[in-house]
């Protein structure tokens, strides 16, 4: 089946948790089918933190052209909508050139938008985001859920009182536009990749295997320059609510630079945070990706 892939489909989509080996698989399949690799990870778009976000280096690219990696300054806002517009332009260009796009990354929402369209959500002012996230920290999710119940009872009924992120998102929309989030979710943009015309792969390694990779990877990141990356990032004095400032490893290494943590503690804390993130990713993939996604434990099985 894999040998005839390029003639039968319009794209390859590969997702999976961090450290699952999906990037190497993407390169291998792109090499085999004369394709290119397109990033679908929300952290790997930033021009900083190449090591901490495990952005592929030249030797790992295997001579395959890579797109949407490291092209966004760390202080610039970036959203799923922006990524989707960039991906759409690339897909159109590659189609004219007769080259196969191989999307790879761990941001599940990117794949949902790519194959199912994206609701036309409005941009939220940074000040509104900051204020509501501060309130979430200070008041807690249940208090904000009570406010959402009064302002948008329909959405509040669908959101758990403990789900702070979704509650804040719904309140952001109301405050920015005066309209409930549901009014935007009802309309969706165009589908960029027809899911019936794509080979869809999700890499789900066994937990002990994945955890071993994560532990080794974080220690290697420190040895390869992650501390210097964070030092340079902190020198930019970006607002703490910027996504790049929340990347796994940044808070831990920043604490070490302040003398608040040892290197050993940073490695342990960073690996633990990565394992938690991988757990959330795997839960999302299992719940959100349907049976048309090919589930594999070992990327080498597709060799």
Swiss-Prot record:
Gene3D superfamilies cross-referenced by the UniProt entry? 1.10.20.140, P-loop containing nucleotide triphosphate hydrolases
Signal peptide residue numbers: none
Q: Name the family the entry cites.
A: Belongs to the IPP transferase family.
EC code(s) of this entry: 2.5.1.75
Species of provenance: Rhizobium meliloti (strain 1021)
Q: Which UniProt keywords apply?
A: ATP-binding, Magnesium, Nucleotide-binding, Transferase, tRNA processing
Under catalytic activity, the entry for this protein gives: adenosine(37) in tRNA + dimethylallyl diphosphate = N(6)-dimethylallyladenosine(37) in tRNA + diphosphate
One example of a Gene Ontology biological process annotation: tRNA modification
Name its co-factor(s). Answer: Mg(2+)
| Highest taxon of the lineage | Bacteria
A single MF term (Gene Ontology): tRNA dimethylallyltransferase activity
Identify the stretch(es) annotated as Interaction with substrate tRNA.
41-44, 165-169
Q: Which Pfam families match?
A: IPPT
What is the protein name stated in its UniProt record? tRNA dimethylallyltransferase
Per its database record, what is this protein's job?
Catalyzes the transfer of a dimethylallyl group onto the adenine at position 37 in tRNAs that read codons beginning with uridine, leading to the formation of N6-(dimethylallyl)adenosine (i(6)A).
Region entry Disordered: which residue ranges?
Answer: 141-161
